[in-house]
Curated annotation (Swiss-Prot):
Domain EngB-type G: 18-187
Binding residues for Mg(2+): S33, T54
Disulphide bond pairs: none
Name of the gene this protein is made from: engB
Organism encoding this protein: Ureaplasma urealyticum serovar 10 (strain ATCC 33699 / Western)
GO molecular function, one term: metal ion binding
Listed InterPro entries: G_ENGB_dom, GTP-bd, GTP-bd_ribosome_bio_YsxC, P-loop_NTPase, Small_GTP-bd
Keyword hit for Thylakoid: no
Record function comment: Necessary for normal cell division and for the maintenance of normal septation.
Annotated TM spans: none
Any single biological process term in GO: division septum assembly
Keyword annotations of the record: Cell cycle, Cell division, GTP-binding, Magnesium, Metal-binding, Nucleotide-binding, Septation
Protein name: Probable GTP-binding protein EngB
Length: 208
């Protein structure tokens, strides 16, 4: 059963352990909280019609991994000083959190912006996996994604196989998204175990 753990503003307030983390990030009001609740199949994240309500790093326990909800980029309806604070919160998590194994960037399939593009490009050269989740697919024509996925992928500078359409409202593809998150965590764990074995073997050979 998924549950809320804590909110944190500063890096030293984050959970201290080696649990793998999946991060969700997106513009304000793209439905991140609703999607988290859909993944949990219960209300564990606060939802609001007011953009920009998430202004801390929120941690949720999903048993095999921890889900981390970052403040929305785009910073709707906040002062310039608060914008700087939120940017710092986002940067310190994405730049320094060693538990992070993948980022799922949540976008509104109806409104893709330059902010979405800039954030997608930021993830290009990072050491963790990056996927784009197009939320609110229930509000577009059924064939919209299939007809435009190449254009959407090009606009966001990401490969088509890293795009996934969902609807938190209608629960469309939510199970598929959850399965993908668990798969990424398993693959990351396997890679780390393999790396440790190789390091141990190399160390033993040096001793000989």
């Amino acid at each position: 059963m998924a549950k809320f753990i804590k909110s944190a503003q500063y890096f030293d307030q984050y959970p201290v352990d080696k649990q793998f983390e999946i991060c969700v990030i997106g513009r304000s009001n793209v439905g991140k909280s609703s999607l988290i609740n859909a993944l949990a199949n219960e209300k564990i994240a606060r939802t609001s019609n007011t953009p920009g309500r998430t202004q801390l790093v929120n941690f949720f326990d999903f048993n095999s991994f921890r889900l981390v909800d970052l403040p929305g980029y785009g910073f709707a309806r906040v002062s310039k000083d608060k914008q700087l604070d939120l940017a710092t919160i986002i940067d310190q998590y994405l730049g320094y959190r060693q538990n992070l194994c993948a980022v799922f960037q949540i976008c509104d399939i109806n409104v893709l912006t330059n902010d979405d593009v800039e954030m997608s490009r930021y993830f290009e050269n990072q050491n963790y996996a990056h996927f784009v989740v197009l939320n609110k697919v229930d509000k577009v024509n059924k064939s919209h994604f299939d007809n435009n996925k190449q254009k959407i992928a090009k606009f966001l500078n990401i490969s088509v196989d890293r795009l996934l359409c969902v609807s938190a409202q209608k629960n469309t593809n939510v199970a598929t998204l959850f399965a993908l998150m668990k798969k990424v965590v398993i693959e990351t764990r396997q890679k780390q175990l393999l790396l440790k074995k190789e390091e141990k073997k190399s160390s033993e050979e040096e001793i000989k």
